[in-house]
Amino acid sequence: MKRIFLISLLFSLAGYCLAQEGTNFEDLTFKEALAKSQATGKKLFIDCYTKTCGPCKYMVKFIFPLKECGDYFNSNYICIMKDMEEGDGIDIAQKYDIRVYPTYLILNHDGTVYCRLDGGAVSSPKEDFVQKVKDAIELAEANRKYSAGARDRSFLKEYIKILRVHDKKRLQTVMSETMIQLGVDKLCEPENWTLIKTEINNVDTPLFRYLVENRATFSKHLGQQEVEDKIISVYSEEFRVLKMMGIDFDKRMTDLKQFEKDH
């Protein structure tokens, strides 16, 4: 009997230790959590879920209990979980426009968004959820810095590197906003031309339009074949997407032919 008791005790302690190792979600209202966030100097992490969300349940059962999650989240955040369909979760869903589950919010002490991961679940511990959060924070901080006017060469180089991995759509915008002003000569330098070749793949991107409008000058630096191959590849991708999505193909073709004729 004593032996059975000891074995049961060991299993209980093991379960307790595992629970302690994982993420500590506190039973607090949103208002209480914000107050504690301010008092402790930690940001607020909110797991926004619904009862019918399968990935939400997986995260709670298999990911948040991991030691690496506990080490990271418990050290840096006040953590709460909120059902977006009941209690103060309803207000949170409305305030932060939560449309995908799970969504993970990281809030500043005043309730403003520091970072968010919409549909941020992982499907395996091997995917490293902690690193996913860190990457999202890195992107959010870089976006804020860019929006605040940072344009120095070292920052832009690092920012574009981040965007190439995490936000291809924004990358197109940032490259157009920062690279056109360099002029054709600079854009034909190996590093810049490689970026254009690999990342500019949308016919409506201003940088692509700039390339088409100045194709003759680009060709003098890079060779006509090199430039025309790039232009044709972007048009080909556009046609493929149009057909796949069933968009008004004929009208779009007419617009693009006119653009090509004008340049």
Label the model's feature ranges.
Residues G15-A19:
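Sec/Tat signal peptide C-region and signal peptidase I cleavage site
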Residues T40-L44, S75-I78, Y101, N108-T112:
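Loop/turn elements at helix/coil->beta-strand transitions in domains of secreted/extracellular proteins
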Residues I4-L13:
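Sec-dependent N-terminal signal peptides
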Residues E26-K43:
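A short beta-strand-turn-helix
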Residues R99-N143:
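Non-catalytic, surface beta->alpha helical segment in thiol-disulfide oxidoreductase systems
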